[in-house]
Regions:
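Mature extracytoplasmic/periplasmic domains
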Residues: 281, 285, 290-347
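Early extracytoplasmic/lumenal segment of secretory-pathway proteins
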Residues: 41-113, 243
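C-terminal motif of bacterial Sec signal peptides marking the signal peptidase cleavage site
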Residues: 26-29
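Periplasmic-binding protein-like
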Residues: 219-228, 265-291
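Extracytoplasmic ligand-binding site segments that recognize negatively charged/polar headgroups
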Residues: 58-65, 100-101, 105-247
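A ligand-binding cleft/hinge motif common to bilobed small-molecule-binding domains
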Residues: 110-115, 247, 252-270, 319
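Extracellular/periplasmic bilobal clamshell ligand-binding domains
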Residues: 332-369
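Bacterial signal peptide processing site
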Residues: 31-34
Length: 369
């Protein structure tokens, strides 16, 4: 699986700089709001190949050739231009500053800079026939206040528990609370991102809505993490770091995704992924049409492709969950277990809290000790 952990870390590190950049754009009169935020009209002929130029702005692991080559073959007269970003905050700053894109990738834990500036154009859900087949299509974050579809879910990754099955009995690991069991002191790692770390701590404490904690609850989780700080061998700042901690034998238990677990297995590490009884935290990303999109027909064509069983099978072979269950038979047998959308059952979408700054400050204090 590609490095989703690094995505989130980069997002939080860039917050202050990008807020200042946003202010500069507003002062300069370059802010959002001049685009069209009406529902994007569907193509007159949805089956016709796309033509013209389509500009696609997304995370780097979304715009890889194995995923895009079939779309290019289906639309030979379309010029597809791609560009990547490191966070939705960075994407919003560029789009508000005049960067042109027709389709942009959005993630539920960081999309507010795009929505607050009016940089997204709602979609006609009927123009995406597979929409209701997709995992998380019914999540409230997918729609705006008027009930219009803002983006089409295209990828997700459940965060559960990773256990070294040679050292620990996987049947005894069932809860986020196990990360804090003193029996495993010094052999546990925690992903070093505010939402995931605070979320895992909250669930371990019995708080069942980890993305909507009050400031007081965030403070309680912070104190809980500080009280158990010696429990953790490391706070892993990337998927690669987490893999290395298990390979070296330093860590026997951690929170993490199925893709990271699969990477370890391929490297010969005896690990097993476990869905916690509280529910797995999960990042969720998808594709949206920008408010200044020029090629609406091609934008719908691309979004429908990403929602298709064919594209989702490719995504499954890349280590992601296949958001369309009809893709599962097309996924390579080696990846079918990790790609199964049933992995997202009872998942808790990571969304951007209204008091995200409180999560950030709390986690910084935990890391500082």
């Amino acid at each position: 699986m590609s490095n989703q952990t690094e995505r989130k870390i980069e997002m939080w590190r860039m917050t202050i700089a990008l807020v200042l950049a946003a202010a500069a754009f507003v002062i300069a009169g370059c802010g959002g709001g001049s685009g069209n935020t009406d529902v994007a009209p569907p193509p007159e002929d949805a089956d016709a190949p796309a033509t013209g130029t389509l500009k696609f702005f997304a995370y780097g692991d979304t715009i890889v050739d194995p995923m895009l080559d079939p779309f290019r073959k289906q639309n030979p007269d379309l010029e597809l231009k791609t560009a990547s970003f490191d966070s939705n905050k960075a994407a919003a700053a560029k789009l508000a500053g005049g960067f042109e894109a027709d389709v942009v990738e959005v993630c539920t834990d960081e999309m507010s800079p795009l929505t607050a500036r009016g940089l997204l154009r709602p979609l006609d859900g009927k123009a995406v026939p597979a929409f209701h087949d997709l995992a998380f299509s019914g999540a409230p974050e997918v729609r705006d206040a008027d009930g219009n579809v803002l983006f089409v879910p295209a990828s997700a990754g459940p965060q559960g528990l990773i256990v070294n099955s040679d050292q620990l009995d996987p049947d005894t690991i069932t809860s986020y609370a196990d990360l804090f069991d003193p029996a495993y002191v010094g052999e546990v790692a925690l992903e070093a991102t505010p939402l995931t770390a605070i979320g895992a701590g909250a669930l371990a404490m019995g708080l069942d809505d980890p993305m909507n904690l009050s400031d007081e609850e965030v403070e309680q989780v912070k104190e809980y993490l500080l009280d158990h700080r010696d429990q953790f061998r490391a706070f892993a700042e990337s998927d690669a770091s987490m893999v290395n901690l298990f390979k070296s034998g330093e860590v026997q238990l951690a929170d993490g995704g199925r893709g990271t677990t699969q990477t370890m297995i391929e490297d010969g590490v005896p690990v097993q992924w476990i869905a916690p009884k509280e529910g797995s935290l999960s990042w969720v990303c998808g594709l949206a049409i920008t408010s200044k999109a020029q090629n609406i027909d091609a934008a719908y064509k691309l979004i429908n492709y990403y929602a298709s069983p064919q594209a989702q099978a490719i995504s499954g072979d890349m280590g992601f969950v296949a958001m369309n269950p009809k893709a599962l038979p097309l996924v390579s047998p080696a990846f079918r277990k990790t790609a199964d959308p049933r992995n997202l059952k009872n998942a808790i979408p990571e969304t951007e809290p209204e008091n995200a700054d409180a999560y950030d400050r709390a986690w910084q204090e935990v890391q500082a000790g």
